[in-house]
């Protein structure tokens, strides 16, 4: 076996001095371990299932020698795969043999099976040039589960559910007469004796293998004896109940095959994990290799159910993590590989039969096609719900995406059927799944995130590390605890790090977790303790300082909004952080890291050349690369020529990183006060300094592409000679018809000139064309202009043009031209900004700096937030961050604060902030920084009048992010445009140049104001009255009064037609005043 992929990376960070070092796993390590497990174990497991294939006459045999398979190093690099829209994959070769049994000859060849996409250094895949990631899925673990429900009489009914590896379910239930039934469908149930007999047991074996044989004998009447008299009778009875067929079916081989396929294969295959769970729950010793449900399992389950009926045993909590399993990238890729081998087997069988029929020469090479494996993986990465396009908005988004856990997907739940209990936080999530980080909306609680120290174990369970507590000893030992072992230990949850120098807990009573309950017990009864304050949070939640002072809902919003932050043109480290910023930036892979020590011999914007150990290494840098959210990924060199560096040192900072630390936003001076209503309801007032000094300026790169095809009339042409177009639209095209690099383009400009040939008949020519043809004999062009034009809102600078030409040039392999345009966006009214505590808002006004409120030293404030957004939202952490940020800015310090610091001392956060403010006040000789009458607040002045405000105002430095929800992407207007064909009303949506909907409530509002003419215009001229809107356009150009529409609009006509389809005729009439005659008007 050849394997050319290995990643095993861990980072060390210091912990307490008395316990040396501990290891924080790489944030992408779960993806790496899963893929390595697939390559090392999954491939061989599926290969061993591949059978020897024989022809119908059993003269020829085909087999694979799977022990000698080879994975070849990829032929292209990651960058080239993205650039050329290819898949970063490895070719799989396997020796295969073709044996002629008559002559005992064998022909062996190494054949190409197909391509397997490889995981790159970011833990992602590159498929057709697009970064994709496979997220982990949480499923109900196969095994047996016991529960009780109340029937309509209020009596408890006990049932056991057997879940197979395929997700199929079978139930055993016990009724009031202590009879045990197996429910094979929603309506049908059969006796446990019939099920056991159909699985191969006779009555004597059944009675010998149960603990309560008298209960089984109690409902054994003559009819039941006849049903289980033989295995055939039991199978017939079982089939009759399962398939719901009437009459008397006859036992046959096809009947057994159908039952095997529809029931036993889907509901009785437990798998490796199911067999382990079944043995543990029922105290069995069946070998792990026996993965099918046996009669012994069913009888043991029935015994346990009887014990439940009489009060023995415990019920199962279906939402406990010990009853869940993680379906990782290894399992998903292995399933697809097995599916591809099944398709390959069918293809080989068909090829052998066809070749023998047509008397063709057979070789292993021409029997096997690579399409089975390649197309299986392409469809998996393109269509499977758990294979998603990697979100690359910023570095944090990339690493968080790979650590998601989803209850959704094949075999899982759906957002509309999942109950509240499944979505809720469970005590077993502690240290494994973050209780905060989840999606908002319909999928809340169904998509979670792994805690930072959690790992996925061999059996698909989530494990979390803890330290064993040894009384009166310094010795520590770290253990990874699976959810099934939680019940046996008492875990300290509070003061896990508050140890004295001897390693002994100073406090006697500590909060702890035992058997899914949170208690307060003596330290002597503690078995395990946490290893890190962030242990139970995800990465996003771990980056929120003072998170313990925030409401959980706001912390959830913050962890989601940090993933929406746009990388800024000039990033800045946060003054107040948590200490995980460096780890997050490092694991995201956006920074360039030195792989060995050496000396820098050359550096520029394109590459860094490093000399070390006698070799010269060239490290290419990312230059203005577009992410799939149109943000700009760029690397800036941080080392100079001649500098000696060490292994692991930062060579170049990436997008949203500074000095190797994550830097998503900016430290700006904020004030919490109302200002003329401009910060009403979460609106934000900002200073013009943020615009003019490019504080919140970001670059966005958009991609526009066009393809050339070979049509039935001939090939399409790329050219700069486009007839009937104005010259200024073509001014940026080069001689090839493609926009020149560095050009500034505006809306409507031609980016790529393209002509499509079309059929030419005499009637299609314009009169002047026919005249030119008749007089001068000039051949008029019959090509149609199909140029790539810059859409609305796309103005910017052309930074890259790519012309991808694939071999063949047919319509199936079209040429693709991509144009990349960079936009510089300053912050403006309508953009969304947010802090790290769920405090979000929209820019409402940009005020000149002289009008902004200013401090006592004359510094104008940068942002003004509404103070009413704090008490009701209960996110007080922003107040601590704001005040401590001010102290850090004045003292030139950066703070990295672990959460839950109240574990050491009461009011620890408040004391820290006030002490730093007091020190800043003393060192800078500014008494207004800390005023004892109102600590943290200060008297500030109105910039318009120079007068102080009535009340002291909270001011400070907060870390504020600019989010990707920007007004340039959302603002939209329409005068006229496209209309729907059926209703003749304007289309909906910005992409279709649609209009704004005037719905039922909008009509009520207009009616309430009595604006009859505006209401009539909304429902006629501006909507679906075809003739009236045409007349409006004419009278607007010519002048004059707009005529009043007399007939009905198109939507009313549509209603009439729909009523006619229901055989209802609707007409309206006019009654004459003179003779009261009815004049009929057709609708």
UniProtKB/Swiss-Prot annotation:
Keywords: Chloroplast, DNA-directed RNA polymerase, Nucleotidyltransferase, Plastid, Transcription, Transferase. It is found in: Plastid, Chloroplast. Pfam families: RNA_pol_Rpb2_1, RNA_pol_Rpb2_2, RNA_pol_Rpb2_3, RNA_pol_Rpb2_6, RNA_pol_Rpb2_7. It catalyses: RNA(n) + a ribonucleoside 5'-triphosphate = RNA(n+1) + diphosphate. Belongs to the RNA polymerase beta chain family. In plastids the minimal PEP RNA polymerase catalytic core is composed of four subunits: alpha, beta, beta', and beta''. When a (nuclear-encoded) sigma factor is associated with the core the holoenzyme is formed, which can initiate transcription. Its EC number is 2.7.7.6. PANTHER family: DNA-DIRECTED RNA POLYMERASE I SUBUNIT 2. It is an enzyme of class 2 (transferase). It comes from Acorus calamus var. americanus. DNA-dependent RNA polymerase catalyzes the transcription of DNA into RNA using the four ribonucleoside triphosphates as substrates. GO terms for biological process: DNA-templated transcription. This is DNA-directed RNA polymerase subunit beta. GO terms for cellular component: chloroplast; DNA-directed RNA polymerase complex; mitochondrion. One of its GO terms (molecular function) is DNA-directed RNA polymerase activity. The gene is rpoB.
């Amino acid at each position: 076996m050849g394997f050319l992929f290995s990643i095993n990376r861990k980072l060390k960070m210091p912990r307490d001095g008395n316990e040396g070092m501990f290891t924080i796993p790489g944030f992408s390590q779960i993806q790496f371990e899963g893929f390595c497990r697939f390559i090392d174990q999954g491939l061989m497991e599926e290969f061993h299932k591949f059978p020897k294939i024989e022809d119908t006459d059993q003269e020829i045999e085909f087999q694979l020698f799977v022990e000698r398979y080879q994975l070849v190093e990829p032929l292209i690099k990651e960058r080239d795969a993205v650039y050329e829209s290819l898949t970063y994959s490895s070719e799989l070769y396997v020796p295969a043999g073709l044996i002629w049994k008559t002559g005992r000859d064998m022909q062996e060849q190494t054949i190409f099976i197909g391509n397997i996409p490889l995981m790159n250094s970011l833990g992602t895949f590159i498929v057709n040039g697009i970064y994709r990631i496979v997220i982990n899925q949480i499923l109900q673990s196969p095994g047996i589960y016991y529960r009780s429900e109340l029937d309509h009489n209020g009596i408890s009914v006990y049932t056991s559910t057997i879940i197979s590896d395929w997700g199929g379910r079978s139930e055993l239930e016990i009724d009031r007469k202590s009879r045990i039934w197996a429910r094979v469908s929603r309506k049908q149930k059969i006796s446990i004796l019939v099920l056991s007999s159909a699985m191969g047991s006779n009555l004597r074996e059944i009675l010998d293998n149960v603990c309560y044989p008298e209960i089984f004998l109690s409902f054994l009447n003559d009819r039941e004896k006849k049903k289980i008299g033989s295995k055939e009778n039991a199978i017939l009875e079982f089939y009759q109940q399962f398939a719901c067929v009437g009459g008397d079916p006859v036992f046959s081989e096809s009947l057994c095959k159908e039952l095997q396929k529809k029931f036993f294969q889907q509901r009785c295959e437990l798998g490796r994990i199911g067999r382990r769970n079944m043995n543990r729950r029922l105290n069995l010793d069946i070998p792990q290799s026996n993965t099918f449900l046996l009669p012994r399992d069913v009888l043991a389950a029935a015994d346990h159910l009887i014990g439940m009926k009489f009060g023995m045993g415990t019920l199962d909590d279906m939402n406990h993590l010990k009853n869940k399993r993680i379906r990782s990238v290894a399992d998903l890729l292995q399933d697809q590989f097995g599916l591809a081998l099944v398709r390959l087997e069918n293809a080989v069988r068909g090829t052998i039969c066809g070749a023998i029929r047509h008397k063709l020469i057979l070789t292993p090479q021409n029997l096997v096609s690579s399409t089975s494996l390649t197309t299986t993986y392409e469809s998996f990465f393109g269509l499977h719900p758990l294979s998603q396009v990697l979100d690359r908005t910023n570095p944090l988004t990339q690493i968080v995406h790979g650590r998601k856990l989803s209850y959704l997907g094949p075999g899982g739940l759906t957002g509309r059927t999942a109950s509240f209990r499944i979505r809720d936080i469970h005590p077993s999530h502690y240290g494994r799944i973050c209780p905060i980080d989840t999606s908002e909306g319909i999928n809340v609680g169904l998509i979670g995130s792994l805690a930072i120290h959690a790992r996925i174990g061999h059996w698909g369970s989530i494990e979390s590390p803890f330290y064993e507590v040894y009384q009166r000893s310094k010795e520590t030992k770290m253990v990874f605890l699976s959810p099934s072992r939680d019940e046996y230990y008492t875990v300290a949850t509070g003061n896990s790090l508050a140890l004295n120098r001897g390693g002994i807990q100073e406090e006697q009573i500590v909060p702890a977790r035992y058997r899914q309950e949170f208690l307060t017990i003596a330290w002597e009864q503690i078995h395990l303790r946490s290893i890190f304050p962030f242990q139970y949070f995800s990465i996003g939640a771990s980056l929120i300082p003072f998170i313990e002072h925030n409401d959980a809902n706001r912390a959830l919003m913050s962890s989601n909004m940090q993933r929406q932050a746009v990388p800024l043109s000039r990033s800045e480290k946060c003054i107040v952080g948590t200490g995980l910023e460096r780890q997050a930036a490092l694991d995201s892979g956006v920074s360039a890291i030195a792989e060995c020590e050496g000396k820098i011999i050359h550096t520029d914007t394109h590459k860094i050349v490093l000399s070390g150990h006698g070799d010269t290494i060239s490290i290419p840098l990312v230059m203005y690369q577009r992410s799939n959210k149109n943000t700009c990924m760029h690397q800036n060199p941080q080392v100079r020529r001649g500098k000696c560096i060490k292994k692991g040192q930062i060579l170049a900072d990436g997008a949203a990183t500074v000095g190797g630390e994550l830097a998503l936003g900016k430290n700006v001076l904020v004030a919490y006060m109302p200002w003329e209503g401009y910060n009403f309801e979460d609106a934000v007032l900002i200073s013009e300094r943020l615009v003019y000094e490019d504080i919140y300026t970001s670059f966005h790169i958009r991609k526009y592409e066009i393809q050339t095809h070979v049509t039935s009339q001939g090939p399409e042409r790329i050219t700069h000679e486009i007839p009937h177009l104005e010259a200024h639209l073509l001014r940026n095209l080069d001689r090839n018809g493609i926009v020149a690099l560095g050009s500034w383009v505006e809306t409507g400009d031609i980016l790529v000139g393209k002509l499509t040939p079309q059929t030419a008949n005499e009637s299609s020519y314009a009169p002047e064309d026919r005249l030119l043809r008749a007089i001068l004999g000039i051949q008029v062009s019959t090509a149609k202009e199909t140029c790539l034009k810059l859409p609305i809102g796309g103005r910017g600078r052309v930074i890259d043009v790519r012309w991808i030409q694939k071999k063949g040039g047919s319509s199936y392999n079209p040429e693709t031209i991509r144009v990349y345009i960079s936009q510089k966006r300053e912050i403006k009214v309508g953009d969304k900004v947010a802090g790290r505590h769920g405090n979000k808002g929209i820019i409402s006004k940009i005020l000149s700096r002289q009008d902004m409120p200013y401090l006592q030293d004359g510094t104008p404030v940068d942002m003004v937030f509404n103070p009413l957004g704090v008490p009701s939202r209960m996110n007080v952490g922003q107040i601590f961050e704001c005040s401590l940020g001010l102290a850090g800015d004045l003292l030139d310090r950066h703070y990295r604060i672990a959460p839950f610091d109240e574990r050491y001392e009461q009011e620890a956060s408040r004391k820290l902030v006030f002490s730093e403010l007091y020190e800043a006040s003393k060192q800078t000789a500014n008494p207004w920084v800390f005023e004892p009458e109102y600590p943290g607040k200060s008297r500030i002045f109105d910039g318009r009048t120079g007068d102080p405000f009535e009340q002291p105002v909270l001011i400070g430095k907060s870390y504020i992010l600019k989010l990707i929800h920007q007004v340039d992407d959302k603002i939209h207007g329409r005068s006229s445009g496209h209309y729907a064909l059926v209703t003749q009303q304007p289309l909906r949506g910005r992409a279709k140049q649609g209009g704004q909907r005037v719905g039922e409530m909008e009509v009520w509002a207009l009616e309430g104001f009595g604006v009859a003419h505006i209401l009539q215009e909304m429902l006629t001229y501006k909507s679906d009255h075809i003739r009236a809107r045409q007349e409006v356009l004419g009278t607007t150009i010519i002048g004059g009064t707009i005529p009043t529409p007399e007939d009905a609009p198109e939507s009313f006509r549509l209603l009439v037609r729909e009523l006619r389809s229901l055989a209802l005729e609707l007409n309206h009439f006019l009654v004459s005043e003179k003779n009261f005659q009815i004049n009929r008007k057709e609708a």
